[in-house]
Structures are given as structure tokens and as C-alpha cells.
């Protein structure tokens, strides 16, 4: 399904589908890098370079967050960026929306530029540490850690979030 759709659909009974899509896109980028180093044929390089951009298929331009997408192309509804699990693995949309390690400039562009990117990134630390644990039916330890840290919706299990500031040369913000 991923190869055909360019994302793992939300409505096909595959858990953690958006997380999988983001991870597969990164994996494809890694394969592309290895294939390039091994001087593989251009057709093969293009396949993996193109699939590395599949993260864009689960980016919702309205919420500016990653979101589950159904097989028919519609985004999952209802949607709560605070819902842990479901379309994500031990995290939520606020956490996974930054999981584009291989194309940070592409993510910045999708969000509408550096100013909006920083505002969204700041929001992770500003929004209250609220959560929806209905997928798990209980508070898992990652949720508890997030609430105890009291740093908004930042969960330290997703360490790349503060490092995202460095893509904008905002090292001083990343250090706090």
C-alpha cells in the first residue's frame, strides 16, 4: 500500500500509519544515500529519492502538522494533535511533525517559511501538556514523562525537536 499510495493509509487497519510513513520516507532517504555511494543506476537512485519525499503526503496544510490520511486521500477525522498512539508510535502529531530529519528545508517550506516554522516549533513548548490517551486506554510512561517535565507538549523521547531550531541557525534557542 505504501508504494502505491505514497503513504500508509489510516483506514486500512495498520497501526501507527503516519509514524510508519515518516519512518519509511527517512529509510528511503538512507537507502538513496547508500545507493548513491555505491554508484547504483540513476533509475534506482530516483526511486528512493522520490520516495524519501513521501513525508509530504501526510502533511496537513491546514493544521501545519503531520496527520493520518485515509486511502481515498482525505485526512482522518476527527483529528486531535494531542492524541497519543493511533496514527503515531508512543507520541502524537505535535511530536512526529518534526520527523523529517533528511529534508528540514522541505518541512520549513511546507509550513510556509522560517517564521511559521519557528512559531510552530515554539508552540510545542508553549501549549499545555495536555493529552488524549484513549488509544492506549491508560497513561503510558512517555505521557507521564511529558507531563512531569512541564515543557508544553514536548516529550523528551523525541529529542530532535529542540535541535530543529538549528536548521534556522537559532542555536541559542536550541540550547535552552
Set out the residue ranges of the language-model regions.
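Conserved small/polar residues in nucleotide/adenosyl-binding loops
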Residues: 1-5, 166-173
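Aromatic side chains
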Residues: 2, 24-26, 88, 96, ...
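Active-site cavity-forming subdomains of large catalytic enzyme subunits
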Residues: 3-40, 44-55
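Catalytic cores of carbohydrate-active enzymes
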Residues: 32, 37-161
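Alpha-helical multipass membrane-protein architecture
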Residues: 115-119, 169, 174
